[in-house]
UniProtKB/Swiss-Prot annotation:
The protein's name: 3-deoxy-manno-octulosonate cytidylyltransferase
Record's function text: Activates KDO (a required 8-carbon sugar) for incorporation into bacterial lipopolysaccharide in Gram-negative bacteria.
Pfam name, any one: CTP_transf_3
InterPro entries with a match to the protein in the record: Cytidylyl_trans, KdsB, Nucleotide-diphossugar_trans
Similarity comment: Belongs to the KdsB family.
Tagged with keyword Transferase: yes
Domain of life the protein comes from: Bacteria
Enzyme class: transferase
Gene Ontology biological process terms from the UniProt entry: CMP-keto-3-deoxy-D-manno-octulosonic acid biosynthetic process; lipopolysaccharide biosynthetic process
Pathway membership: Nucleotide-sugar biosynthesis; CMP-3-deoxy-D-manno-octulosonate biosynthesis; CMP-3-deoxy-D-manno-octulosonate from 3-deoxy-D-manno-octulosonate and CTP: step 1/1; Bacterial outer membrane biogenesis; lipopolysaccharide biosynthesis
The species this protein was found in: Alkalilimnicola ehrlichii (strain ATCC BAA-1101 / DSM 17681 / MLHE-1)
Cytoplasm is among the record's keywords: yes
Amino acid sequence: MTTPFTVIIPARYASHRFPGKPLASLLGWPMIHHVCRRAEESGAARILVATDHREIAHACREEGREVVMTRHDHPSGTDRLAEVAERLGLDDDQIVVNLQGDEPLMPGRLVRQVALDLAAHRDAGIATLATLCHSLDEVRSPHAVKVVRDRQGYALYFSRAPIPWDRDGFSGAAGAARSPGQWLRHLGLYAYRVGFLRRYPALEAAPPEGLEALEQLRALWHGVRIHVGLAHQVPGPGVDTPQDLAQVERLLAEQGPPA
């Protein structure tokens, strides 16, 4: 039997690097519309946009999207999801996927994959995905979050540093570092059980969370198991700054305009 799941798309207006980002035009449509189309391709039972801004809400409602207005002071997208889950009265065992509002190239099949991965691992509170790194520059980049898993695929740690550290390769003692395929790059796509989302806002922040600026470390620090699956495909890039729009628009044009 197919596991039903809900996709919630947090869409914040006041991005530091790109204010109003969800409304940025891509192929004549607001970016948030493209993200909603990716969610629809996943086969989700329900799709909601969670936003703190009336213009974003208006743009979504014009296209018939379900919108939940949230507080503007949430420190993270996970906190925003927690508010939505609480307000909608979702059951603790329901699965919610957090699809970021700046990921118009995230394939719907990956959204579905992460939801089904969580459903298959009952002892996990969270599921997420990773891909193999493709270059040593990617391994070393602090913008590419790396993850180390145990033998069953559960996360041991996430870091902006190149983990695991190649002692010989990176020190130069044994020549060039190993193939970049030895490292896993984390994708910022999560599935949560609603029971965990309800607990999250009350959890004490973890010391490494602030150092790394990675909110998933809070869950690990509190003993929540995070299952990390290998993504069935490599997604296109997200939109962090206005400079990213041209590349993303070109890639979207190759896929065809949204319906």
